[in-house]
């Protein structure tokens, strides 16, 4: 009879209630310990545990058999990857890191960055050559001192032409130059005849530790008899909830009657922060279910409802707009908690989505540490590995998830390299489409029949498309 590895020390799981070694021998011991942690943690919390045979409670007859299995993998990373369910189609997002300090920092908005955020595209007529576009310049960053602006185009880094094979390595440098270029559309709507022309300006960029405020831009737009609030929000970071609430105080003071929420570059973040933002947008649904977090079959008792609230974690009252309709701007980089905002709000109010189809991620994660109850408390000091696996899935009050291929927009517009526009400007294409819809205009939207999509590469941020559960301070 097989011994079941229930691993009682992991059954506590109160964390869900908001809760380099140089010596060779040390390396071997550390690696063995880390692999043991990886398997036991995934066995305890992984959302798709029942789909992975090697995570079954009765998979191994003895500790010796389990140890032999762990020893068959040369690194913790390879072991972790072997435990992922259908990496290409289902679990595209679970992460292992050998430096949880770095992960913690980025989830709090801190990273090594030049302050220039890019999109990359395959050059028309090529299958390997790439050009980049500056999509955002972060304030008070190294890039903000260079004169770069949104929409600037470049095709070289450190003098090397950009290709699909060298782009990642070039971006990994702490210091590099970009060579500006010009996008020539040949005065036609056809993309295939567009050209990227070399320029003569070179810009120096340097990475530094940067704390990013996710509130990138907000303003009031007066249009006929309407007052429209506009907010570009780039990450659900709990440390900025009070500042976000102040933005909504300004919207309330100005008595706005429409809101355009720009999430086109927002790849996710804290579930509680998303719940509080939804409560700022509405207000009339206090204490009703905003979203539901569902765990694996063994952890159903941990399932949790996130309710619309009227206060922040610090007990300050939330400034609520009581809106019945919202406009949300998206791109193919909008993910996770951004998608949850759309999916969960649409159960209560009208959501007009403008832009591109989103990533398609309903699942939530939590940092899992090597400690007795998998929390940060009393963490193993012998290494800095941690996991960020998918542990739960979010559904709205109607038990609907975000489609795995993303949420399709009501009005489909893809950013064009030849016309990015300025963030917050009424002529910026995505915002302009929202303003036209608010006006009830019969004018045709620029639907971009000839679309060019960004090249799929990890951005300058190491960890993206994350929706995570974090211990509450309440």
What are these language model-derived features?
Residues 3-10:
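Sec-dependent signal peptide recognition
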Residues 16-19:
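C-terminal motif of bacterial Sec signal peptides marking the signal peptidase cleavage site
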Residues 21-258, 451-474:
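Flexible, low-complexity junctional segments that flank or bridge functional domains
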